[in-house]
Amino acid sequence: MYPTDLSDSQYKLIDKIIDDQRKRKYPLKNILNAILYINKGGIQWRLLPREYPSWQLVYYYFRKWVIGGIWEKIQSKLREYLRIKVGKKSSPSLGIIDSQSIKNSEWGLPDKGFDGNKKVNGRKRHIVVDTLGLLLCVIVTPANVHDSVAAEWVLLKMEGKFPRLAKILADGGYKGERLIYLARSCLKSVFEVVTRKDEGEFRVIPKRWIVERSIAWFNWHRRLSKDYEANVESSEAWVQIASIAMMIRKF
């Protein structure tokens, strides 16, 4: 058993969310454990230990669940369960948005670009978290896509999913009347840009540190150290899987 493997109780919680009772040659628990192992260790598919099912089968389920939205479903439900467990409402009232530019792997990938500000050639993760640092939404774009442009896509993706969301906090990189309009029209929320009043002195912006901490948490998962994926949908799924891995340990 590896440190990333699920306990029986943890697997039962995820299995209830997946809700697929078809008979299989290999238990879903073994397949999930293999994917969590890859997420944490950052290894290639073909290097999966023999204790797990074949890498081809594991990859098949990974892609199937990317396309079917299963990773997002698991991540969303676990977040609701965890929020309730710590005494909060299942749906958050505050979101915090930020981005992280990540280098791509050495071999050529589509959907990549150069972030002139961070001097990174690759892709950019745009994430929204709640006040616990739990993932609400993730979108991956080429690194040259401006934060304000990507934030529009994030807000559109979040539409209809968070009925209590009253405000989204952002830093000075997110500007534009359209973001304010989209937050109000799509989410019935306020989009608030929070900046440091004194640029000459470092100050922690209230609650902004939460999303920065979440990004640091994701960096503990070596599959996220670079972007190795052939498409951005898989890139987004690995962020969701990292979030699942962190939350399931709380149960």
Question: Positions of the model-derived regions?
Answer:
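Short alpha-helical elements
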Residues: 1-251
